[in-house]
Amino acid sequence: MSELDLEENNPLLPPSQINDENYEGSIFGEDARFCPNSRQVFRICSNLKLLIDKIIPICFKEDEITSSNSAILSDPVIDLVYQAAGGKGDGKEGTSSYKYRGSLVFCLLKVCDWYWQQAEFELSDNELYSLRALTAQTIAAIIIEREKRDKYLFLNMLCHRYTICVNGVDATPVSALEMAVDMHSTIVIGSSGYQRCIKWLWRGWIIQSSTDPHSYVLYKGAASQSFRTHFDPARIKTPLYQNILEIFLSIIYLIIFTIVVNTHSTLTGDIDFFETVLYLFTVGYILDEFIKFYHVGWNYLGFWNAFNDTMYCILTVAVCFRIASVNSHGATRIKYDEISFRVLACASPLMWSRLLLFLDAYKFVGAMIVVLKTMMKESILFFFLLFVVIVGFLQGFIGLDSSDGKNEATQRILISLVKAVIGGSSFEDMGNLVPPYASVLYYFYQFMLTVILMNILIALYSTAYAAIVENATDEYFALVAHKTLRYIRAPDQNLYVPPFNLIELLITPIGWFVSTSTWKNINYYVMLVIYSPLLAYITSDELSNARRIQYNRFKGVPDDANEIDTEWDLTDGYDEDSPGDGDDCWDRIRERNSEITEELRIQREGERQDPEFMINTHQFSEKIDKIVKPVGQASKVGVNWQIYEVIEKIDKLTNLLEVVVAENKELKKRLENKA
């Protein structure tokens, strides 16, 4: 059967009227049958662990492992890593090694996890096992950087979900992409190949297979000029467009919240339109949190989930009091109404800060969020120590207060201890309580709080900030990767972004009584209506990108090439908005080629105006090669490039010495024969 013509201007047909296999011919990927099984994955991991155990017998400096010219992770070592995957051949498509090497990144991350477990259980060798874990991550990054086949790297190595047999039980399938994020392996996440894969996932050029939940596939429609191909509700699943939609809905949510909080009348009336919309938004977001947690599990929980859940709890309390006020009368109604709006007002800081959740894909905001999250985690230790100290002193003060058989100052004591944390307390607060015992005890409390605990907090914050700033770029990459996977891990086949998930909830009972094809059609048209404004933007954006992608494929370069027109390369760049002389894409491609040719011709003419200006570029390149440091050659033999030339000269002298020794032996034999 012929492949669906994506360039055809098809009508907006529902999924049931389109051949699924042909239409999903717009995607193509790797079949799971051509990937190693769980037992084979375990053997590959064991081989890699044996290799790393041998090459890291003692503790080296981390720089000797992570540096780009590492003498430890030399080319022969990386060749052994490939051999550890098994199979025959050199990794080319069609060989068995091609099949097994696709799991190398996953296996290396799994080995890294094993080393982390060993470091935790065997504290005496903690540093050695941590270094081996670092080595496994570094090798994984090297494997990613060395792979030049985009499809193989993205689909087989990073996105495919592999499973490993541990103690006779197959573990839950997970991809190297997801494992790196869950392990927070910034070394792997920061590699260029990994980031390109994340970029393709973010743009929807890589999507999950509709037939195999463990595989991802390339979206062929990225280069299509068909309006129908891009004006499809399924494209809402793209993380980029989900993020845009969520930002837009969050701004609306914030505007409605502001209207409700700041226009509240003293007269307690019924729930108005804006309150109704606010409450529906809130219910939709809470429902979405429950569904995602149910499907994804504990991996879904994070800093922002705790932040949002706290805000939703406050809003839920406000809604409950508001509903109670409507159903009450007299003074009770007024009281509940006041409580409702006062609680609602307390959610304002969280509501505004929530916008950062959707803006963290931008580097400035993202780096700031990473620092904030790290500092909040470091604060846990401080607050634990603070809690223990406060409880201890609280018990002491209460004991002093009750020494006369009466308990009269418990509330004042507790308030004073808490106020001391924020600097709002004084020594006079305890001056009248069982002198001089309470005063002496309070001096100790103030000393411990201000001199010891506060300095611990400052040190923790300083360490956290320094660690993040030093590795800010990779930490930002990790944040974006986590955000992208958060969208991709969403379980919905039909994506209804809150509060539109309430519509899905209302129409779900219909699916119990109609056929599967009819249910698909209903969801298709519902999403087509509610998302039509965004789909218009998506279509415009993707049609613009499609022209550049077609140009890249014509030139034989990756789809994401020529996105930036650099000043030093006259042949790169592509103006997506240029209409060309004709409507056909080939007219635009020919026009761009003509522009490049003309620019190169003008450049050469300008260079040749002075005959003495030109140099022999071939000879110039050879001279450059002669003075370049032998980094590549040193890596091949596993030595530091700084001593490579010395070692090379020693090797030459050794060879000459061996020749002299051999000639002397031959001469000695001849003399003995003559004698």
Curated annotation (Swiss-Prot):
GO biological process: calcium ion import across plasma membrane; flocculation; intracellular calcium ion homeostasis; invasive filamentous growth
Disruption phenotype: Leads to hypersensitivity to oxidative stress, increased sensitivity to killing by macrophages, reduced ability to invade epithelium cells, and attenuated virulence in a mouse model. Shows defects in hyphal maintenance, hyphal growth and flocculation. Prevents the localization of the Spitzenkoerper to hyphal tips. Enhances mitochondrial depolarization and apoptosis.
Entry function: Vacuolar calcium channel involved in the release of calcium ions from the vacuole in response to hyperosmotic or alkaline stress. Required for activation of CAP1-related transcription of oxidative stress response (OSR) genes, but also for maintaining the stability of both the mitochondria and the vacuole in a potassium- and calcium-dependent manner. Contributes to pathogenicity. Plays a key role in hyphal polarized growth and re-orientation to host-signals through its contribution to the localization of the Spitzenkoerper to the hyphal tips.
Induction note: Expression is down-regulated in response to alkaline pH when CRZ1 or RIM101 are deleted.
InterPro entries assigned: LHD_YVC1, TRP_calcium_channel, YVC1_C
GO molecular function ontology, one term from the record: calcium-activated cation channel activity
Organism whose genome encodes this protein: Candida albicans (strain SC5314 / ATCC MYA-2876) (Yeast)
Coiled-coil region list: 644-675
Gene Ontology cellular component terms for the protein in this record: fungal-type vacuole membrane; plasma membrane; vacuole-mitochondrion membrane contact site
Superkingdom per UniProt: Eukaryota
Protein name, as recorded: Calcium channel YVC1
Similarity-based family: Belongs to the transient receptor (TC 1.A.4) family.
Residues annotated as transmembrane: 244-264, 271-291, 301-321, 355-375, 380-400, 440-460, 495-515, 518-538
Protein's membrane topology: Multi-pass membrane protein
Keyword terms of this UniProt record: Calcium, Calcium channel, Calcium transport, Coiled coil, Ion channel, Ion transport, Membrane, Stress response, Transmembrane, Transmembrane helix, Transport, Vacuole, Virulence
Cell compartments where the protein resides: Vacuole membrane
